Amino acid sequence: MKPHLKQWRQRMLFAIFVWGLLFLAIFIYFTNSNPAAPMPSSFSFLESRGLLPVQGKQRVIMGALQEPSLPRSLEPSKVLMDGHSASPFNSWPGDPQKGDQAQDGFDNGDEFFTSQVGRKSQSAFYPEEDNYFFVAGQPGLYHHRQGALGLPSPGESSWQSGPGQPKQEKLRHPRRGSLPEEAYDSDMLSTSMSRAFLYRLWKGTVSSKMLNPRLQKAMRYYMSFNKHGVRFSRRGRREARRTGPELLCEMRKRVRVRTLDGKEAPFSGLGWRPLVPGVPLSQLHPRGLRSCAVVMSAGAILNSSLGEEIDSHDAVLRFNSAPTRGYEKDVGNKTTVRIINSQILANPSHHFIDSSLYKDVILVAWDPAPYSANLNLWYKKPDYNLFTPYIQHRLKYPTQPFYILHPKFIWQLWDIIQENTREKIQPNPPSSGFIGILVMMSMCQEVHVYEYIPSVRQTELCHYHELYYDAACTLGAYHPLLYEKLLVQRLNTGTQADLHHKGKVVLPGFQTLRCPVTRPNNTNT
């Protein structure tokens, strides 16, 4: 019996050894798999909900998104690797000049943009340093639980984990001596943007070359798509080197807020003249407003405690469906003007005609039109049908000031952005935020803009009132948001402290500017 028992034991040991090898092989296989490989389910979710429409009616304008639910496939445990938060922004460590050396995006020809299309990306920027690990295909699933002024809540690290993750160790600083000290205020910066990149954004030294490859692809897609038929002549490159005061004076000379007045075809033939308000938008406050606030809907405004400061202004502009109830401490409760895109009017879920959100305020609507500003073509085929709801609202509330911005005004703003940017920008209209800023600069002596350029509370939460995360909401894909913000940064007359801690930019109103008088050259001898 002993030889048989010994043989049986040997077989058992051999079987255990084989199973051990098999388990080890499986373990090595999964641990060596590439965690940065794209996850199709994640990207398809982002394509459908966050950034770029593919065509026509699926266009997404910032501020009009429906509140989405996060897909089950995006598990929080897959967002982090080795305890490190996935920073979606390139920090450009080691060479602070690298990010500035973006090549001029203009072609040799005088015109660009021909035909159209679009895609979307989940995260705006990607790191090249090993210290920052970005999981491709994952949107910014950062847990939105911050203390006052964007500081992490007790028990959290200053670089937050995904939802439900335990406390993680802080990331190592990438060659701290290579960047100014302000870039490493680790106790103040939130998690979804690298210290170095946010500092560069405050300084206006970022470019599209730092964008995540997918977002760059989305931008190229829109440039080739050119839905609105943009044909722009570059007119030289000196404009991109204008100083802030020079740019302000140029904008004062060219920017004229214009709305539909019912005098142009096809509206004149449709009886719109008595329908539109008798007093033009630019003349509602003939003496001008002293101080105005433009409140962005960015998620970064949460936990800011800016509500009292915002309400102290003479007038407050808000966007689309952004509420105040329940958010008064951070955003205030005063609303004077509300800029709304055409989706707000056309989508029944917004209850535009009956909602109290759109009552007792000045309403200013807009819709993308062809670059040619052909009103007949626009009326026949708007991006979203805002004309019928506009008529219904005017008939029901004839005394409420309600205007539709003229397409020429919208595209005039786009021209100014492109002329003052060395790179090609997306051939799509500016964002509602940029439009609102320019409208208020024409009406107010001083404009305070909150969280257009992000503060230390920067987060991937798109809007403070919607549970939807996407880093692209900060830099855009459909709208040329990156270039808009760089231009506004050049105009800022406020302090760096306000920009960093409040996300506040201060802009002078056009009426307060003292610009040199341009005299025509005397050709007489």
Swiss-Prot record:
InterPro entries named in the record: Glyco_hydro/deAcase_b/a-brl, Glyco_trans_29, GT29-like_sf
Give ranges for the Lumenal compartment.
Answer: 33-525
Q: Which UniProt keywords apply?
A: Disulfide bond, Glycoprotein, Glycosyltransferase, Golgi apparatus, Membrane, Signal-anchor, Transferase, Transmembrane, Transmembrane helix
Q: Which cysteines are joined by disulfide bonds?
A: C249-C515, C292-C444, C462-C473
GO MF terms held by the record: beta-galactoside alpha-2,6-sialyltransferase activity; sialyltransferase activity
**What Enzyme Commission number(s) does the record list for this chain?**
2.4.3.1
Q: Which domain of life is it from?
A: Eukaryota
A Pfam family reported for this protein in Swiss-Prot or TrEMBL: Glyco_transf_29
Q: Which reaction does it catalyse?
A: a beta-D-galactoside + CMP-N-acetyl-beta-neuraminate = an N-acetyl-alpha-neuraminyl-(2->6)-beta-D-galactosyl derivative + CMP + H(+)
**Signal peptide start and end residues:** none
Mark the transmembrane ranges.
12-32
Q: How does it sit in the membrane?
A: Single-pass type II membrane protein
Location in the cell reads: Golgi apparatus, Golgi stack membrane
Where is the stretch described as Disordered? 85-107, 145-183
Q: Which residues are glycosylated?
A: N303, N333, N521
Q: What class of enzyme is it?
A: transferase
Q: What ranges are annotated Cytoplasmic (topological domains)?
A: 1-11
Q: Which GO terms describe its cellular component?
A: Golgi apparatus; Golgi cisterna membrane
Q: Which GO terms describe its biological process?
A: oligosaccharide metabolic process; protein glycosylation; sialylation
Q: Which family does it belong to?
A: Belongs to the glycosyltransferase 29 family.
Q: What does this protein do?
A: Transfers sialic acid from the donor of substrate CMP-sialic acid to galactose containing acceptor substrates. Has alpha-2,6-sialyltransferase activity toward oligosaccharides that have the Gal-beta-1,4-GlcNAc sequence at the non-reducing end of their carbohydrate groups, but it has weak or no activities toward glycoproteins and glycolipids.
Q: Which PANTHER family match?
A: BETA-GALACTOSIDE ALPHA-2,6-SIALYLTRANSFERASE, BETA-GALACTOSIDE ALPHA-2,6-SIALYLTRANSFERASE 2
Task: Write down what this protein is called.
Answer: Beta-galactoside alpha-2,6-sialyltransferase 2
> Which organism is this entry from?
Rattus norvegicus (Rat)
Read off the lineage from the record: Eukaryota, Metazoa, Chordata, Craniata, Vertebrata
